[in-house]
Amino acid sequence: MKALILVGGFGTRLRPLTLSLPKPLVDFANKPMILHQIEALKAIGVDEVVLAINYEPEQLLVMSKFSNDVEATLGIKITCSQETEPLGTAGPLALARDKLVDGSGQPFFVLNSDVISDYPLEEMIAFHNAHGGEASIMVTKVDEPSKYGVVVMEEATGRVERFVEKPKLFVGNKINAGIYLLNPSVLDRIELRPTSIEKEIFPQIAEAEKLYAMLLPGFWMDIGQPRDYITGLRLYLDSLRKKSPSKLATGPHILGNVLVDETAEIGEGCLIGPNVAIGPGCVVESGVRLSHCTVMRGVHVKRYACISSSIIGWHSTVGQWARVENMSILGKNVYVCDEIYCNGGVVLHNKEIKSDILKPDIVM
């Protein structure tokens, strides 16, 4: 079985983290975002994954190296399909047609790379086989459907009737979750040009009464921007608590759900949690307070520092008694000096912060 992951976005909303890496390779819960998806696909028998990447030469180099590393580690075939111009969300499928179709007639998965969930892919295969349609999409319930494109469907069968973009009147509360299972015949509907699968292809299939939607059980989050990244981490750790609690940290210094890489060092008198991920090679000195945050690979947090609701990029340093909070994002190799207050600061790579950031600001 095969799958395609759409990884062509530029990740502008997660800058500065995406200035040096494609968004799918930014760490989430101590591993690249996209690796969560690849592991889930391999677990249900997918043996080849196509990464649909954008036209930038640098992305091909970085994603190819990642692909080689994952192939060697997981034993799953990964290939890249690179567009020469922006092709939207459907055009990349047409471009990768020869990689996705092998004559077996098997359906293939398509995933958006910035979606994090429980990935109930086996259930989706069973759903797809049962309804006998041409395509299945996963949907999730939201509290404010007027902000999204809503999927209107038959509750009994799951057949999609229509899509309504940002409805002013209530028509439903289910939205596209960015996980699809498609028959090869769907590719016959897609031309090799900039095309939206959500706005052009799926409405065609729905009109033919061959599109079905499965309600996603468990959590879901599009982690394309910092606040959603932090929320997604909380939901992911909640799920991990239910499925694999042994992977979470324990001890008198741990509060709630915390994920700590085995190579990280934690000092005495710390209070860590809830909803914290501490990456490989991190050093957290004594008396540190961490909550609702991600501390990526190689970060050094000095004594009595406090970090909350923030993302600390690779190999950065947070000084003694410093306070970083309110959706601050530190890029790679940032140095926050002792006793500095960072309130919603977005700090680019390789910067030294010597004075307080009193209100949300970008440090170039």
UniProtKB/Swiss-Prot annotation:
Keyword Membrane in annotation: no
Keywords recorded for this protein, A-Z: GTP-binding, Nucleotide-binding, Nucleotidyltransferase, Transferase
PROSITE patterns: HEXAPEP_TRANSFERASES
Pathway assigned to this chain's UniProt record: Nucleotide-sugar biosynthesis; GDP-alpha-D-mannose biosynthesis; GDP-alpha-D-mannose from alpha-D-mannose 1-phosphate (GTP route): step 1/1
Pfam families for this protein: GMPPB_C, NTP_transferase
Domain of life of the organism encoding this protein: Eukaryota
Enzyme Commission identifier(s): 2.7.7.13
Residues annotated as binding GDP-alpha-D-mannose: L6, V7, G88, N112, D114, G149, N176
GO cellular component terms given for this protein: cytoplasm
GO terms of molecular function: GTP binding; mannose-1-phosphate guanylyltransferase (GTP) activity
Reactions mediated catalytically: alpha-D-mannose 1-phosphate + GTP + H(+) = GDP-alpha-D-mannose + diphosphate
Biological function: Catalyzes a reaction of the Smirnoff-Wheeler pathway, the major route to ascorbate biosynthesis in plants.
Protein name in the entry: Probable mannose-1-phosphate guanylyltransferase 2
